[in-house]
Structure formats: structure tokens, C-alpha cells
Amino acid sequence: MKCALIGERLGHSYSKLIHEAFGLYSYELVSLPKDKVGAFMENKEFDAFNVTIPYKRTVMPYCSYISPEAQKIGSVNTVVRTSDGLHGFNTDYFGFKSMAERAGIDFAGKKVVILGSGGTSLTARAVASDGGAERITVVSRSGEYNYDNLEKLADCEVLINTTPVGMYPNNGSSAASLDKFPRCEAVLDVIYNPLRTQLIMQALERGIKCSGGLYMLVAQAAQSAKYFCSAEIGKEEIERVFRSLALDVQNIVLVGMPGCGKTTVAEELSKLAGRKAVDTDSLVEESAGMSVPEIFSQYGEKRFRELEAQAVRGAAKEKGLIIATGGGAVLDPGNVRALKGNGRIYYLKRDLDLLSLDDRPLSKSRETLDKMFEARDPIYSNCADAAINNDLSPVLTAQRIKDELGSSDI
């Protein structure tokens, strides 16, 4: 069986990885300009296909049958070729509902605010309505409720983002701040790249129930497989594929004192895990055309930190990397937020007597090193998801990190 995904821009899609992880059929990504959609619908090369932005409504007139849920939502994201024409379905409903259930988010009796008024907003509205929401309000750029009068919705209890704001490569932006919603107790964001958007990061910092969109993507793909080939993919298999993909795309971030071995451990971990390792100090040196000590000497620490922030935030946007940071990178809260968006942070601990002080502009003596550790240790500890002792060999430390990642929560 030959299946595909059609859309306008699919360069960063995870759909091929997800569908082929189920092992039921081949799956291709087909980027199409709008004027080619009609020809694709009539071409019988693919037995079934998914549809993403901006064609979920475009394909509907070509379908001889549209399922009740697709009619209710007003969009089709799954099409199957049959003997009597194209049949259209919507599996986003199942995916969104599954994401909310996994996060323990219940809509019954809740005041729900949905950011965005596009096709995915319709899906969120349908799920929240069927779940018994007390009130559902849609926020758009020019509607009665817009981003300039969010204070009118301060009683929001469940916030849902269906806009692309905060999606790669524009990580770090958010359609709204949770500061506007003091009574908010749950957040859902359909964006899956990065794993944790700025909005989800705000929810995590407040201890609010939340979920990014990757689980929705996997769950809706599983439901699509049901229509493609009558496959019944259960929750355990959905969880397996979700977890495997999340671990693969998540960055491994190493933080800690200057000279604690982050770069060396990253290189060993790269060999063990088959991932690319990058060092943010090296990225700074490449962009500046001079060494870190030279940057400090000629331009001072402030300029170095500016270059470092660019390097850290650029690397943090990517997926599946091992990122060895400079000792002071996490002093900037913006860097920490960027790294956490798509990564798991490990605090690499090492006895101060074992630290290398070569070419370390800010830790040239034991006295300055002790003061630095006293100031930075709480910062490293607070930003890290796990702490790993690096007093043994770099190979053993790398193996510890690999093992911890495999057993970590997503």
C-alpha cells in the first residue's frame, strides 16, 4: 500500500517517521502548490493520503463521501481511494481528544479559550464542546475577542493554542502570555516543533497541566492508519511511537562549570548515541573569527554573552543534537528557556580539584573558581532535568546520560 502526506511546505514534517514506525505501509511527503492539488487528487498513484495546511478544505469538493466528523469540523485531513471515489475523514478530532486525555485535561464545565480561528481551531471547538465545556471563546486577530483585549477573558480555565505562533523556526514567541489568564489550570498547544513552546514552558513553570502537539500528531496518524488499511493501533503502540520520536528529536544539553568536561563527554556521547555534537563556544568562535579568550580580551564579557546567546538559541532550535554549552550560558534565563524548549538538560558535576582551567577567562585561579561555583551551582541545579557525576571517565559519563535519557519522562 502506498500512502502520502500532501501540503504546501513539508520540509520539517515528522509524518513520514510516524507512519513508517507503525510498519504497515510506505509513506511519502508530497509538497504541492495550490494549482497542482486538483491534478494530485485525480492521479491514482497513492492509495490513501493525509492532508495538511493549507489544503484541508481545498480537497473536500473532490471527495464523494465526507465522514460526519469531517463535516462537523469542516475540514478533511485523511483521504482514501475507494471503488466509488475518494472518501474523506478527519482524524484530528481523535488526535486532539487523545492529547487532552493523556494530559489529564477535562473540558466539562470549563471556560475554554481557543487562540486562532483556522481549521485546527474548529477541531478544538468540537472536542471541547463534546466534552461539556461551559463556554468556548475563539480569539482571532480581528474578531470581537482579539489579542488586544484578552483581559476580557481573564476567567479562562483551559487555554488552547491553534495558531502557528511559536512554531519552528520562530521558537520563543507566543500568541499570548499566561499572565493574562490567572485562573488558567490547563494548556494545550497543537505545535509539535519545538516539543515545548513558550506557552507550554509558561504552563510548566506554573505547574499547570499541559501538552504540546506531538502526541496529537501520533494519535491522529494512528487513526488515519485505521482508515488506510483497517489497522487497529492501540494506546500502547501510540505511546511507543510517540516516546521514540520525542526522544529522537529532543536535544541533549550539557551544562556545568567551565572545565567540567562538557565538550569531551559530548563527543563520547555522540559516538554512543549516533547524534551530532555541537559546542556553543566553538560556534561563537566560528562566527566571531577569533577565540573565546580573544573575544573577552578585545571586546569584553558583554559582547561574548551576546554572541553566546545567538549560538545557544540557534542550536536549541534544532533537533536531535548534543549541545555542550559554555559554563556561563545558563546565566541568561532566555538561553535556558530556549534550551528547554527542545531539550533535556544535564548538569555535569565534577570535583573542583579536577576542573581544567586552561583558556578559561573567568576562572583562572582556585579562589575565583570557588566563588564562581558558589554563585552558579544553584543555577545549574535549578535549570537541569538531571544531574550526572563526571568524576570518572567521559565514556562512563556518556553512558550514564544515554541510560538516563532512555528512562526519562517525556
Give the residues covered by each predicted segment.
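Phosphate/diphosphate ligand-binding glycine-rich loop within oxidoreductases
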Residues: 2-103, 194-196, 200-202, 206-209, ...
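Glycine-rich adenosine-cofactor-binding loop
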Residues: 7, 90-93, 100, 109-129, ...
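Rossmann-like adenosine-cofactor binding region
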Residues: 145-210, 329-335
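Adenosine-phosphate binding glycine-rich loop
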Residues: 191-250, 390
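NTP-dependent small-molecule kinase module
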Residues: 239-245, 268, 272, 344, ...
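Conserved lysine of the Walker
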Residues: 262
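ATP-dependent small-molecule kinase phosphotransfer cores
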Residues: 279-340
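A glycine- and Lys/Arg-enriched "phosphate-lid" helix/loop adjacent to the NTP-binding pocket
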Residues: 341-379, 386
